[in-house]
Amino acid sequence: MTKETFQVVSAYDGTKLDALCFLPEGKPKGIFQILHGMCEYKERYQPFMSFLAEHGYIAAAHDHRGHGNSVSDKSDLGYFSDKTGKAVTEDAFAVTQALKKRYGDLPIILFGHSMGSLVAMNYLQKHETAIEKLVICGMPKKNIFVGVGLFLNGVISLFKGERHRS
């Protein structure tokens, strides 16, 4: 098994996304693209990626913007973008395109964990023909207090700015 690292430049706004791949020995069966959860990073999935590569898959993961090595400065940690969550979904699609360009037109299996499962669901709605299969793991459940949290976040952002850490 071989490990490769590379960067993908986001088509959304030019953010550099740090990516890691584990390559199997021999001809790969497909590409298993991993979307990690909130406050995680790609290296956390290395044992799983190793397992996938041992079973014939290219295992790929990237750090979402604001996570791991996909930040230009420590102040970017935890910050997605000044717009919406659309950037994270489009980043995942840019990584898919880079993987296909790099390794050929192999079947893509998209795996999303926790927050990554929400990204994967958005991805499916916008780019359903780009993947062959979808695996959802640890999907968050509906929370009745989300509205309160969003309201409080908005109030705090008015006074302390969007990048304030609470």
Each model region followed by its residue ranges:
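N-terminal cap/lid segment of alpha/beta-hydrolase-fold proteins
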Residues: 1-26
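Active-site glycine-rich loops that stabilize anionic/oxyanionic intermediates
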Residues: 36-40
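Conserved alpha/beta-hydrolase
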Residues: 44, 49-75
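Alpha/beta-hydrolase active-site loop
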Residues: 80-100
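Alpha/beta-hydrolase fold nucleophile elbow
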Residues: 103-114
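Glycine-rich nucleophile elbow surrounding the catalytic serine of serine-hydrolase chemistry
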Residues: 112-122
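Alpha/beta-hydrolase-fold enzymes
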Residues: 120-166
